[in-house]
Amino acid sequence: MVLSQLNGLTSPLDERHVHALQIALKGMTPTQLAWVSGYLAGIGGGPLRMPTEPKAVERITILFGSQTGNAKAVAEQLGARASEQGMDARVISMGDFNPRKLSKEQWVLIVVSTHGEGEPPENAYALHAFIQDQGAGRLEQLPFAVLGLGDSSYEHFCRTAVDFDRRLAELGAQRILPLQCCALDYRSDTERWSSDALNRLSALAPRKASNVVAMPTLRSHQDLRSHQEQSRNRARPYDKDNPYTATLLENRRITTLDAVSDVRHLALAIEPDAMHYRPGDALGVWVENDPSLADTILAGVGIDGAARIELGDEELDLRHALIERLELTQLHPTTVRGWSRASGRTGAEDAGERLEREEQTRIYLAGNDAFRLPDAGDTPLIMIGAGTGVAPYRAFLQQRAANGHPGRNWLIFGNRHFHRDFLYQLDWQAHRKAGRLDRVSLAFSRDGAEKPYVQQRLREEGKEILRWLDAGAHLYVCGATAMGQAVDHALVEIFTIEAGLDPDCASLRRYPARECYATDDL
């Protein structure tokens, strides 16, 4: 082929390059042209590489950041759906994911909640901080999508999800779906987003070989009963959308009658194989509205409670919806009440009063992998709790006693009044007497003019706090968001004043071994 035969369809050279090449090669002998040809091939880095089609997806990584278990459940459901469609999907907690490997991933779907004042969940903290850093690398080859869970009544609604979506795009990652922010009633939004994400991925993700098993022929009624029993044994686990029906064994008020808060201790009968919970977990409780109140509303507006209505994708009668599905003060869908294991929540006093012994209630397990006892039984524990935030520590000490773990334990507890609101006082006294509770620091804010809070006790015990942490103690914080922030500030002061650290590096959240710090919001 001569240069004059080059054209735009076959050559990557424009007319200017062709003209320059003609001038350079003019007058060369065949030997010289052969040498130039070899030289150009050498500096060209090898044979010509033609453009290729986009590489098929080999693996989908679903990362979740979850404080109460909702985001984890959504991520696991998404992963299960992807696997059912033949995709190679893995679901990983952000706390177990190495942020530096993000650039190596092929496709990433993020499901993350927001807690506190727009803060990431504990297990999302490291990844969130990594991508926000100015030194974070470029991610041009990474397709991603983000789903956020939050409470739209808060100012920083789904802030963590917004952060991930914005920053990944800034780093050059390819957004395959718009950011989806979901409020408390998130089921329909998460299902729609999950379907959209899987549809986008299905065209490129190669299918794994599916195991198709022929159903056995059922030759008798006995075979049928056996098959039905096996099907029940393979039923999906209990979760928010498939709650377990537990029987109430005890409903006991653990504050005095003249206390401001009516805090309840509930004991539930749960089959051993129904759910496997660990200290630090919480229960989600679907609490029904008072049927008499629903009847009063129906009578007041003159509507038949048997009238059929549509609620989401479900059709049911209006009275049933008012009792089990709707918040009667606002008529938006009810939300699960979170109950710390072994304690009542002050936000559900009326519901707690209505629960009678032997009554059944729907529950599901809200696991919290970020709020666990350390594996080593001799690890010291500093347990900071306010109000019902003390409940998980009751379970912690019970577990340590059952396991015979010798680690030292320090309880720092705050509430309104010593005589009215000292939750589980007899339990703490028993642990103290048995030698399992080495230190107890109390702060009752309404018993005198001083008005002490747990953060004040921390400052007073600053030197001892540092000694325990230097000995490898794990520090836990459980209570309202504002209390957790106040504890953070107190710890910064302790590290700044007592240890001489720079304020910017004085938070336990920036500790090299951050596993020593765990939080749980109420």
Curated annotation (Swiss-Prot):
Give start-end positions of Basic and acidic residues composition bias. 220-242
Classify the source by domain of life.
Bacteria
Class of this enzyme: oxidoreductase
Cite a single GO BP annotation.
Answer: cysteine biosynthetic process
Q: Which UniProt keywords apply?
A: Amino-acid biosynthesis, Cysteine biosynthesis, Electron transport, FAD, Flavoprotein, FMN, NADP, Oxidoreductase, Transport
Question: What job does this protein perform?
Answer: Catalyzes the 6-electron reduction of sulfite to sulfide. This is one of several activities required for the biosynthesis of L-cysteine from sulfate. The flavo-protein component catalyzes the electron flow from NADPH -> FAD -> FMN to the hemoprotein component.
**Assembly and interaction partners:** Alpha(8)-beta(8). The alpha component is a flavoprotein, the beta component is a hemoprotein.
Q: What is this protein called?
A: Sulfite reductase [NADPH] flavoprotein alpha-component
The scientific name of the source species is Thiocapsa roseopersicina
Primary gene name: cysJ
